[in-house]
Regions:
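His/Asp/Glu-rich metal-coordinating catalytic cores
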Residues: 1-71, 76-285, 304-318, 337-340
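Hard-cation-handling environments
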Residues: 201-328, 332-379, 384-498
């Protein structure tokens, strides 16, 4: 958003077609730049060696002197995953987040980055002043504690960035939405509401489909033998549900991987998880039929740990036909193909595979009724659907129009587009900032350009032929060879004529 008393919003990521993940929104108020979230997304094609994708932040580098900070809504990778890459380029940029959000971010930072990082812990409902502008975080319900939305107060009105949220009256403590604070902000006047679109096509409220304790209970009851359960480390609510249900049985949970163990222990110490430690087993319990083995997924390679176990590479766990493999999350955008392949591989081993259905079980994102409630609380003059694919954003726009926001006050944008406001009114801005995406290869830890990807694609489709020989340096006579080496071209034993 640009004000003259100006502000603009530029979606460097998360604002265009096929854009689940890599969220990054820039709000520029009289040259004061506020960045909301900086996340990654996964490559859904399972090829070309790409681990994950982040937004191009050349614009931020160019304008780094004007950046007031990066404001993180919560600790999921779609919202914090690009921060380490930004800090590589702009080490001093202030990063604001709640206690747990910053703890999750610290896990992604290299030791040298952590020393230099300018991390600023915030508390919900405590205003942060930046001259004539200010930021006010409000607690919201998501699958991780300490999630917030942000209200950016400007001279011409408030911009509200919801982040990811649901309305669920059963949630308490660090998961609870402060509806009173949201309503108070709405009464003061909201110029523009930026609301997520992930489930905008789904009717009703997301709750109670975001809670799966009953399904976990059913899996535990129907499968008396050993269960190997995958869990996303940042989905604290699901981890809590798992521990709650296991504690009602005679089973023990064995937590595999030091990273997951450390995270759970720290979360328990900080009060974000409640765990009966007598239910936590050790490696000696791995072979017991009534054990639940908890394994985590890694950032760069979803299902990587489970894949290692399936292929027999794991030192401690070998899958048996009596085992049940329990995928505790519905496949989210970006990993659908990999999830389907994993389920096939489990079936080939003869083990039982159980997963959450994306039709019956929902993630903690706002459905249509949640969006309607948020819009009614905020009563914004302008509405800006963000996150999700374009069809989700279009559905979100329809929700807003359905409850009374004029069509001309609903903003649909592509990555790099600018929504400009002058003295509180949306202008017909044609400005566009050139942005693209950065493809990260975990091996090289750098941006993989289009030319490299094209070469990889050609090699994958056509193979390679290498001709080598040894030459005399002075006479250029052939001393040895030539030798022909092929990979992925033809099967040599059956192609002697060639």
């Amino acid at each position: 958003f640009r004000w003259q008393g100006w502000a603009y919003d530029d979606g460097l990521g998360g604002a265009c077609r096929n854009e689940n993940g890599k969220n990054l929104y820039v709000v520029n108020v009289d040259r004061d730049i506020f960045v909301f979230d900086a996340g990654l997304k996964y490559d859904n094609d399972l090829n070309l060696g790409i681990d994950y994708i982040i937004p191009n932040f050349d614009y931020l580098i160019k304008n780094k002197k004007n950046i007031k900070g990066i404001f993180l809504t919560h600790g999921h990778e779609s919202n914090i995953g690009a921060v380490p890459d930004i800090l590589e380029q702009i080490p001093s940029i202030p990063v604001y987040g709640t206690k747990l959000t910053l703890e999750m971010l610290k896990n992604d930072l290299e030791p040298e980055q952590l020393k230099k990082a300018n991390l600023k812990e915030i508390k919900a409902h405590t205003k942060i002043n930046f001259g004539k502008n200010s930021i006010f975080p409000i607690s919201v319900t998501h699958s991780i504690p300490d999630a917030v939305c942000f209200v950016l107060y400007t001279p011409d009105g408030a911009i509200v960035y919801t982040g990811d949220f649901v309305f669920d009256a059963t949630m308490q403590g660090a998961y609870k939405t402060d509806i009173g604070k949201l309503a108070y902000v709405g009464k003061q006047g909201v110029l523009c509401l930026m609301a997520e679109s992930f489930y905008a096509e789904k009717e009703g409220h997301t709750s109670p489909s975001n809670r799966v304790a009953g399904f976990i209970r059913e899996v535990l009851a129907k499968n008396p033998n050993r269960i190997i359960a995958t869990i996303f480390p940042a989905h604290f609510y699901r981890i809590q549900e798992m521990f709650n249900e296991v504690s009602k049985t005679h089973r023990k949970i064995v937590i595999m991987g030091k990273g997951l163990q450390d995270m759970i222990n720290k979360a328990v110490d900080e009060g974000y998880l409640s765990v009966d430690k007598s239910r936590i087993g050790t490696l000696s319990d791995l072979e017991n039929k009534d054990t639940v083995i908890l394994i985590s997924d890694e950032k760069e390679k979803p299902f990587n740990n489970l894949d290692r176990i399936i292929k027999g590479y794991d030192k401690y766990i070998k899958i048996k036909e009596t085992d049940t493999i329990f995928i505790t999350e519905p496949a989210y955008p970006g990993i659908e193909k990999r999830s389907a392949l994993i389920m096939d591989e489990i079936a080939m081993l003869g083990a039982n595979a159980v997963s959450l259905s994306s039709k019956k079980h929902l993630l903690h994102h706002a459905s249509r009724e949640d969006l309607m409630l948020m819009i009614n609380l905020m009563n914004p003059k302008y509405y800006f659907p963000v996150k999700g694919e374009y069809r989700n954003q279009y559905a979100n726009a329809e929700v807003a129009e359905q409850i009374g926001i004029p069509r001309e006050n609903i903003i649909l944008k592509e990555n790099g587009d600018v929504a400009e406001f002058i003295k509180g009114k949306l202008t017909d801005s044609k400005e566009h900032i050139e942005v693209d995406q950065i493809l990260i290869d975990g091996k090289s830890q750098g941006d993989i350009g289009d030319l490299v990807l094209k070469d990889r694609e050609m090699l994958g489709e056509n193979g390679i032929v290498i001709i080598s020989c040894t030459l005399d340096k002075q006479t250029k006579d052939i001393l040895g060879g030539p030798e022909i080496l092929t990979r992925g071209f033809v099967y040599v034993k059956e192609s002697q004529d060639l």
